[in-house]
Amino acid sequence: MKNNWKRNTRYMGVFAVLAAVFCMIVVLNINTGNVQISVPEILRILFLKKGTQVQMNIIWKIRLPRVLIAAILGGALALSGFLLQTFFSNPIAGPYVLGISSGAKMMVALAMIIFLKYYTSVSSYVLIVAAFTGSMLSIGFILLLARKIRNMATLLVGGIMIGYICSAVTDFVVTFAEDSDIVNLHGWSQGSFSGMSWSNVKVAALMVGITLILTFFLSKPIGAYQLGEMYAQSMGVNIRVFRVLLILLSSVFSACVTAFAGPVSFVGIAVPYLIKHLLGTAKPLVVIPATFLGGAVFCMGCDLIARMAFAPLELNISTVTSIFGAPIVIFMMIKNTLKNKIRIALVFQFLIAKCRMHADIFQFLNYHGITFLPVDIASQFQLSYVVKHSCNCKIVTLLMRKSKLLT
């Protein structure tokens, strides 16, 4: 009971801090700019709709739609990363790293060039469908690679290469576009929350809201899947259908972001990692809303910095998210490497100290939730095994000398 009380208090504390920071950043985003508007004036304009026409236009037509779209898309991007990390069982997986954002960017660029030849503007729904199609194409190639490549690091490199290919195709298409189309594409392809209208906010809120609700419905299967496929199957989870749903939901989140704001980097990796460490848990029912709120706070804060750091010049949103997100990813990779080394050392120590028979290894590791699968017997004196820890899905390969370890 005491531990539960402490845990719940920690959860409520994290949510309270995130909510307070969220409100503070919303006010700062509306308050700051070339025209300063005080907090009392903001409250009067928002709730009483009283103020000068200039102030009303600045808040209702420019700043408020921008901050809302940043919050919605930031939360969507963070959850897209969380779902991909669950799918691949790797904290480095994200829509930008795996080339999913680049695939969406490629298809949106094609859609914009084609539709702008015949129409003056492109519907938000058309952009979302195009981005979703591009996301699914990239995911399809990654899944094909996953059937051939078991090493996660190599798979991530493959995702990066797919991203480069999609970016190259996008650049090739833009080269042959008309000058007016190039201007629109250039601003969008750099990543920005500027120029958003209320129609954009409504469409994004509708798409992201529906996908968020569906993600909540998957919270229990996600929790079971985090403990390993075998455990999830024993709990009645249809693994094949579940994995398809993870990919679809992640692609919808990523497509919404790319369709409206262009490619935004590192949010899908950095935010879920930070949220899990702040909460001290990976329970989906707690992590999903916290990740969405954390992504909203992160993107709104980065957008504020992008607008005000070198005003009146405005930075690309991806520039700012990379500055703050990349160091977090580097730290995460170093920390995971150290954990893997410690884990390997502990397994080796046990094998050397305790194992006297082949069966002992299987019994001990299976008892402690570790799946021990023979991969290849290279020779009479050497065995190759893959040890997969079901709780954190870290994979290591142990090459053991039969004469030394299995005496």
Model-derived features: positions:
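Alpha-helical transmembrane segments in inner-membrane proteins
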Residues: 1-344, 353-356
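Residues marking helix boundaries in flexible regions
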Residues: 343-345, 353, 362, 371, ...
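Ser/Thr/Pro/Gly-rich low-complexity, intrinsically disordered segments
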Residues: 349-350, 363, 385-387, 395
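Cysteine-centered motifs
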Residues: 355, 391-393
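Short hydrophobic alpha-helical segments enriched in small aliphatic residues
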Residues: 359-361, 369, 386
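Short, intrinsically disordered C-terminal tails of secreted or membrane-associated proteins
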Residues: 397-406
